[in-house]
């Protein structure tokens, strides 16, 4: 078909086209001879559908749109409230409780068999949680008991308010690193541990307030500013930084840097290794690290032994503690945890410090922690909810996580969120509901009451080994390779976050990732793609000529589609210049191929992708129209959206182009050439 169109046009192109009307006539003959068009009369029998576009009602203003959305939100709630009023009072109370506390919904159908599964999952979870919580507390520069506190109250609150059945709540490595790396710049935890603890609790309070606000006001889109690629890079960089910091405990080093960048950490390790380090501590830590990693390999290979890697850290703690106690290794340079304060979480409302001179910085750090913690928790929750086949309510998750951190800050807990590694263990152990979190929290509480004295001789190197064993799960090389193959710009955000965390600091890594993500959005807005369209053979479908090389170009017509939702000040001039450039190139190319002068008569602009246009966009369209008219080319508009056609009418642009506005490209070509294409 393409060859027939070209041959027909070639037969006419040997004549010089003196004016537009003659050119149009000759193109019509070419198109008719090609057999790709019906008779002109067939086109005249069709209704003039362009009037539907031009006579459409006025679209709602932005103010009315905002009012409609707010009204719709309130009407939805009002309808729920009215339906609630029709119910008996006891059912009203139950419905309200279920909305706030989902546990009242699923506990009514709770069975003994489900509890057996949750009990096994909760106990398995606790065996992993207890040693990890102690290790993560030391990573956050807090006393070990604060990690255990964080594994008691937040999981209980989440079990009442959360919607995920599998997520395991507690302290995590990345949030612990964020807290220590940013807050120790304000107060040194070594010289002023009480002041540092107050900062941590106040930061946790702010993080919870931000998280709950995101859910209550439906501001979850703020979390999306950290793209998936940025999170992958950030997690990978943070994992390496955390691993390097654990060399202090693994080598038994006393003096260590407070910086988190890789250069400072490696320099500190090198200096310490030349002066003082404990071979006994290193051998002990590496031995149990190998043991934990081997059990993890066995658990992955044999699915029935999923419980083995889960209890391996607890076994490592118990065995190493007995070894140190029996051999008195603590007298030979092996550092131990020593005193861990037991008992129920003490109240800490009085420790929240809102009079500190660092309040502004604490609020900023709280916002960062809130976003990172929510991103991790919601990603984990949605992953496992998808496997189980149910929907996770993102807004309720934000509210639940926010309230658990606010209440956690009142009970000596630091920022908690969902842990991917522990959630995977919880899922593999066969958990049915959030009851597994309750079982885990009760088990940790029992450990706080009864077992803390037994941890006096637990080597710090073992805690470092437990943290190191959890880090490979944070480094997702396969996902990084996948991102590289799919989207190079996303991979740039990944690399920026990774190297930012690794060579600068955690907050710099996050900032780099967000800046690159914004830069991607801005570049796409400034330089949107423009497609040159052609007709698919034997159809009335017009598609991108680069994607589908078999498409047939219509002689004398250039058809463009702008791949952008907005035609605005940021991209209008660029789009105008590129279209004019293509028009000039097309005419030069056609003139080179044939000795006779071949004329472009129409430029058809498909606006089906555009949602809105501003005054700069309209000005650019006017300039494009004026430039095309000077070269004897007419501009035709196709399928503008409601807001777009309204603004073009208001600006009298439709009158300027002679009302050449059509619903489809085919109708535009029919009208231009008087033929049905």
Curated annotation (Swiss-Prot):
Keywords: Glycoprotein, Membrane, Sulfate transport, Symport, Transmembrane, Transmembrane helix, Transport
Biased composition (Low complexity): 28-44
Induction details: In roots by sulfate starvation or after selenate treatment.
CDD domains attached to this UniProt entry: STAS_SulP_like_sulfate_transporter (cd07042)
Tissue expression notes: Expressed in root cap, central cylinder of roots and in vascular tissues of leaves.
Chief location: membrane
CC per GO annotation: membrane
Domain of life: Eukaryota
Topology of the protein relative to the lipid bilayer: Multi-pass membrane protein
Any GO MF annotation of the entry: sulfate transmembrane transporter activity
InterPro entries: S04_transporter_CS, SLC26A/SulP_dom, SLC26A/SulP_fam, STAS_dom, STAS_dom_sf
Reported function: Low-affinity H(+)/sulfate cotransporter that may be involved in root-to-shoot translocation of sulfate. Plays a central role in the regulation of sulfate assimilation.
Protein name: Sulfate transporter 2.1
Origin species: Arabidopsis thaliana (Mouse-ear cress)
Annotated gene: SULTR2;1
